Curated annotation (Swiss-Prot):
Residues 317-336 have a biased composition (Polar residues). GO terms for cellular component: cytoplasm; nucleus; ribonucleoprotein complex. Signal peptide: none annotated. GO terms for molecular function: mRNA binding. Residues 49-132, 188-270 form the RRM domain. The keyword Hydrolase does not apply. Belongs to the RRT5 family. Keywords: Repeat, RNA-binding, Transcription, Transcription regulation. Residues 17-26, 410-456 have a biased composition (Low complexity). It comes from Eremothecium gossypii (strain ATCC 10895 / CBS 109.51 / FGSC 9923 / NRRL Y-1056). This is Regulator of rDNA transcription protein 5. The lineage of its organism: Eukaryota, Fungi, Dikarya, Ascomycota, Saccharomycotina. May be involved in the modulation of rDNA transcription. It comes from the Eukaryota.
Amino acid sequence: MSDQPAQSDLPDQGALPPQEAAQPQAVREDPQPQQCAQQVLFEQQGAQHRVYISNLSQDATEEALTEFLKDFHPVSVLIPSQSVRGFQKTSVRPLGIAYVEFKDADTAAKVILELNGVTFMDRELRLRYHIPFKSEKEKLARGPNKFRQIQRRLSELRRRNSDAGATVTTDNGPQVDAAAVPREMSKVTIYVGRLPGRTTDKDLRTYFHEYLPQEIIVFKHRQFRGWRIRRHVTAAVITFPDHERQESALESLSNLPFNGRTVRMAPAFEDKLAEIRAEVQRMAVEQQLPQPASNLGIYIGNNLIAMQPLQTRKADQQSLQSQHSPQNAAEDQTITAPPPSQQQLPQLQPIAPPLSLQPLNPVENTQPVQGLDLSIPREHEEVVRGQPLLRLQKLQMIQRLQRLHRQKQRQQIQQEPAAQPAAQPAAQPATEAAVAPQLVPEQEAHQAAAQAEPQQVLERPIAAGA
């Protein structure tokens, strides 16, 4: 640890300027194997000999890990553990991490590049440089936020590697670099930000109706305020016929509230506008939506997320005509039962015309449906399932079938009592006449048997005495 090599001897340090090498570098908890080169590039100031290993198996020991790293000749291997106290005994459990120290920085960098993501005891190892602990006083004395410094350095590296300039993130917020190419502003499209969350393109079209807006796209994007604070902001881009109407809208409506909220208006960027339109077209093709992009509302998070249609389409005339086709009318007629004979049930009302000829009255039909039993009689179940009708027509048809079923039950109940009293008066005398002759011989036989028994009893003693 005491032998520190020179700054020029470090691998990958020659690609960085001297003023950037002294800045703290980005370190990720779980880097991917393909990102190891970037991680070695973003090492801390000075040489690093100690490597931090995470996602280590609970069964791994220091001897097994030393044997696994024997090709790199580790100086020391440490697997920290913790003591868990129970009611009867205390157990020691490893933390699943390890600290391995090597003899030089080149070996540590080679270990990170080659073994990051390698499986050891059924676990993929995660390797990075060890970050020494620093007290709160050292953190306060360090100056600006480390995360912002890392973001600024990454932005500078991206800007140097790209042909076109981009924004550079500083401590005071996003600022445009002086060497970057200025972004082109649209001459007919404006950006409207800080809109209410439920704003639709119809509301904006009404608000800008004097300036004849041609295209309105509503979207949402995320704003990051710090490491954990995020919020969604509703915005829109509005395209006008010419540059004069764009300037008039910006001058007259910039300071006026929209639905009780002060909005932000400015000319839109051409590159951002092209990105939004391309995303709208792509999502429209994927979802196979027939309406144009100007009638669509979208959510764009991180500047592009899910689709939100803002207008409903009118019903197709062909679908309405197909519902009232002659074939459906013939099927409706098959549902109606034949009228009962007037001789049996003169009090029943005549059957109503088919459903296709009846006027639809939602007020009349929706009230009794609340407590309605939607069970369909078995004899009409197949007919109901084959009808491509609307919801209101289906409810009317179910009511009609249930009324027919109840009428049929009442008809059967009324016919059965009417048949029984007519047959009983004629059958009753015949049964009495048939039973009466049978009772007379039986009574005479019992009387004769009763008279004959005493005589037999008296005759037996006489015969015995004789």
